[in-house]
UniProtKB/Swiss-Prot annotation:
InterPro entries: Aldolase_TIM, TIM_sf, TrioseP_Isoase_bac/euk, Triosephosphate_isomerase, Triosephosphate_isomerase_AS. Substrate binds at N8, F9, K10, G165, S197. It comes from Helicobacter acinonychis (strain Sheeba). This is Triosephosphate isomerase. Keywords: Cytoplasm, Gluconeogenesis, Glycolysis, Isomerase. GO terms for biological process: gluconeogenesis; glyceraldehyde-3-phosphate biosynthetic process; glycerol catabolic process; glycolytic process.
Length: 234
């Protein structure tokens, strides 16, 4: 399977730097990168999607066409921007913004009906990890049970919560074992990504694991040269 690199800017990228980054990345890449390289700016960092060399996505959207949803972006906004790729279930939205499994299912079903490419994020906390692989499997199974795993436009991203933004990536053995379990659980044709303190030093080794189909990269991707380095490993 072709490897994938995704950049998640979260809320850390200045608006105009984001715009410049997207334009420069478009110049750097080639058409064959379009289905392999994804960028998720925040809302103000988005541009109308005329990019041919990578896929532009959004970090979040509300599961309605439009309406009285103060502060939210909806499918009509995304349609106007020609964006049809979306992150759902990132741990920061689950934990900090209290998005429940039922609400995540509502989002998933809504954007599935719109035929969006969905990147669905899962991952356990440190307390669960310390209980062992059996507890991790049970936790991840519960996170996946509400969504249609046969949806053809689905990508799953495994991001252990304890490794996000901490500088402490999961060990290669942890990734190998967890991805091995997930690959057995998921459709074999579905891309399965790893995220959690990915950087230019560990990306190549992680991509070398057969069950890792790509990377979801946070803070390291904020510098274009770092992201280009990781893309070169694909």
């Amino acid at each position: 399977m072709t490897k994938i690199a995704m950049a998640n800017f979260k809320s850390a990228m200045p608006i105009f730097k984001s715009h410049a980054y997207l334009k420069e990345l478009e110049k750097t890449l080639k058409p064959q990168h379009c289905d392999r390289v994804f960028v998720f700016p925040d809302f103000l960092g988005l541009l109308p999607n005329a990019f041919l060399h990578f896929t532009l996505g959004v970090q979040n959207a509300y599961p309605k066409d439009c309406g009285a949803f103060t502060g939210e972006i909806t499918s009509k906004h995304l349609e106007e921007l020609k964006i049809n790729t979306l992150l759902i279930g990132h741990s920061e939205r689950r934990v900090l913004l209290k998005e429940s499994p039922n609400f995540l299912k509502e989002k998933f079903d809504f954007f599935k009906d719109k035929k969006f490419k969905i990147v669905y994020c899962i991952g356990e906390d440190l307390k669960t990890r310390e209980k062992g692989l059996g507890a991790v499997k049970e936790f991840l199974n519960e996170q996946l049970e509400n969504i249609d795993l046969d949806y053809q436009n689905l990508i799953v991203a495994y991001e252990p919560i304890w490794a996000i933004g901490t500088g402490k990536s999961a060990s290669l053995e942890d990734i190998y074992l967890t991805h091995g379990f997930l690959k057995q659980h998921l459709n074999q044709k579905m891309p399965l990504l790893y995220g959690g303190s990915v950087n230019t030093q560990n990306a190549k080794e992680i991509l070398g694991i057969d069950s890792v189909d790509g990377l979801l990269i946070g803070s390291t991707s904020l510098e274009l040269e770092n992201f280009k380095t990781i893309i070169s490993f694909l």
